[in-house]
Amino acid sequence: MRVLGFLSSHAGTGTAAAHTRWRWLAPLGIQAIRPASASAGGNAVSSATPQAPPCPIHANVGVGRASALGPGPSGFMAPSAGIVTAIRDGPNSNSRCSTVRTHATRSKSTGPSRATSSGPATAAPPRRRRRTSNDTQDGGLTSEQTPTNTAVAAVAATAAAAAGASASAAAPALPVALNPTWRTPPTAEAARRITQAASASAAYSGSSAAAAAAAVAAGPSSAASVARGGSAAAARSAAASALAANANTSSGAASAAAIAATASTAPGKLLLGGDLSRALAAAGSTTAPPLPLPSRAGLSAPKHTASAAAAAAAAASVLPASTPAAASQTPPTTVTSCGTGSGAPATPRAARSPTAAVSVSSADAAAAAAAAAAPASAAATAAAAVLPTRHIVAAVDPDLNGALALIYWDEDPNDPTTATASGPAAATTDAAAAAAAAAAAATGPAARLATLAAAAPPGSGAAAAADEAAAAALLWLPTPPRPPADASRWRVCVWDMPVSAAERQKRTASGQVARRRLLHVAGARAVLSAALAAALPPPGEARPVALYGYVEVPPILPGDGNIAAYTSLWSTGSWLGLLTGMGFTVGSTPVRRWKTDLGLYGAKGKDASLALARALFPGQQPILRHKKNHGRADALLIAAWALGACLPRGLGASLRRNGITLDQLLQQQPGTTVGLVWGPPRPPAPTDAYGNLLTPEQDMWDEIEAAETKVERKAQARSSTARRRKTAGTQEEPEAQAEEEQAEAGTGVVAAAAGAAAPKRRRAKKAAVESGSEAAVAEVAAGPQEEGSEGEVAGQGGRACRSKSRSKSSGKSSSKAEAGGAGSGRRRAASVGSSSVGSSSVGSSSGGGGGGGGGVKAPGASRRRGGAKAGSDGGVSGSESE
């Protein structure tokens, strides 16, 4: 890869200074061209014409300071626009794309030769380096992997010949299809589950896309549209142009409202009115009959489903058959089409889903579906009316300043350079998988991890990847094909992100009203619906549709606040749900992954992404003028990354090794633009924000069975607990009743004994006490004896209650509480009774003594008023003291 800046000749003034200026590019492996001499005026334009037209498949487009090109077969002149094209060289490049070295600088080349400033290129052994995702020219293939890839291709070709796929074997062999190098390699079980989930997603995508096309085709006035075919097409084109104008000139919620208002008069108003969801729900009646799930050996090969073709045939049965002119008619342009011929031709097919039967083409499936529902003539008409598949790739930058980029194109089955990622050169590990991949070559693109043969040389590093290769043989993910080489056949749409704002009570430091911005979900749905209405085939075209969605998933960094993290997750989750609900096969795109592949990871600003987007999509330069348009640039670059765009060979590794980012390169050399090369497309893989492949923990049916088993287990546990409690209650009730009866009987016996033993209180008459009769004296003398007997009875009652409470401690808690309460109450009653009896006897004796002896104060004199009045001599002093 050469960065073309100033052009120079080998002779002239300023050569040494220019060589010193561009010498810093040598460690990066970038071939630079010196500035022109002063005699040429510094802006010399070469008059040489290219000897052969450039090959757009391997073209790198960039903008240099000078609008001139050096002579040679590798470039073409574009002085008006200042477009410079550099063709990468390599053993697998096209013969027309050969490159001539115009100048030799001192650099560390990774190729088979090393150029020095003092002499010609000398042969040098290839340097061994670590493989990175899409870091080499052919999708991550290093020089030491070439024999292995050749052997794998030979094994696959042999299996294809054995399977009878002569058409696939005749296709030109491509290098091993590269897929992302996962951060966490999947196991065999994980690969099987991911494949099953991806197959179900692809089947849903195919059926939902067919239903959406049928919903657009079967509008409220289908009969009128049949009668007015030309006027309806003109109205659709005008509506699409208005949608494009609104998408490019407006922003935010106003753009969403304008899009919704314009699309309400377009054929896609069914999508805005909610009929798309009902159409998707009704799409089950048009899908093919369910087939048994595939085995593990057959999961590596994708198969077709007749859902899209059947829906297309059903739409064609009610709409007029397409004429050749209508079939060749290009779809309406929503936004300025991309002018760079930067794609590779491919022949993708309709959406797939795995089946156990042999795969069939979409035309055969459409013919079979039509034959089952209509006469033979109608079946032939429907089969002839089925057009090539339309592939729609949606890329979303979910940032509030982001955008939605949509790229769609129609396949060309007559292209002689047709080749898919699952062709004869696909890497496999055994003959059965190779035969399955070769048989599936005619069904459409399918991405698999780059696996190596088990018989690879030990030095190639393939032996260490045997486990990963065995697991990757089962992994299949739906992948979009390469866009066509003709840039006029694919369209690019850009839609700004609809944002809503809520005012907060807290004001900013400057006194302004603080607003919290958030994605407007309804506006995002309106934007996506309008984009689909513009990209889906118009009514009258029985064309299958394949949908692929890529959503950037930013990681949550430690320095992010709660509001920032919530806003990011809200937007990302909303777009994932919207794309999935619309029928897209959605995958996560980690920020670090796609920016590393494009050389933007670690960039401080947005100038590098804007420059890359302008160079890659020159037709979108009017909407990429300002720095605030970096969201549109990121969305376009994500779409390009999904279609296989990457840095040139070795440039990304050189930048990382030297600690230089692409934005720093552009800042140091403002007139330098590094172009991108196109490799195999990348599948919409289910990954997290860090590139880890998300694996379903269990299969779908296993999860359902596990949930049902869990519910049954909980119900059984509840019923067994209830039975156990009921049984324990029935056994404890008789024992508790017996204990209660025994306790009551014991309490009654003790109370009766206490009542019989306790003497009754004698009430002395006031006159007898005052007179100091012999009866009062006898009562005072009998007081201590009665007090002793009462204390003995109270002690017996207390001991009986304590023994009774100890016997009940082994019973139920409720019985124990009742028994304890009764015992404590009885103990308190007995103690209170004994104390009252004792105090009365002591008071009587003290009163009698006071009456007889007079003047002697007894302890019980203050408690008995009668004792205080007893003494004639000392009674007065006693009453006064009281």
Swiss-Prot record:
Taxonomy, superkingdom: Eukaryota
Main localization, broad class: plastid
Coiled coil: none
Gene Ontology BP, a term: DNA recombination
GO cellular component: chloroplast
Ranges of Gly residues composition bias in the record: 845-857, 868-882
Function: A structure-specific endonuclease that resolves Holliday junction (HJ) intermediates during genetic recombination. Cleaves 4-way DNA junctions introducing paired nicks in opposing strands, leaving a 5'-terminal phosphate and a 3'-terminal hydroxyl group that are ligated to produce recombinant products. Mediates chloroplast nucleoid segregation during chloroplast division.
UniProt-recorded name of the protein: Holliday junction resolvase MOC1, chloroplastic
Organism per entry: Chlamydomonas reinhardtii (Chlamydomonas smithii)
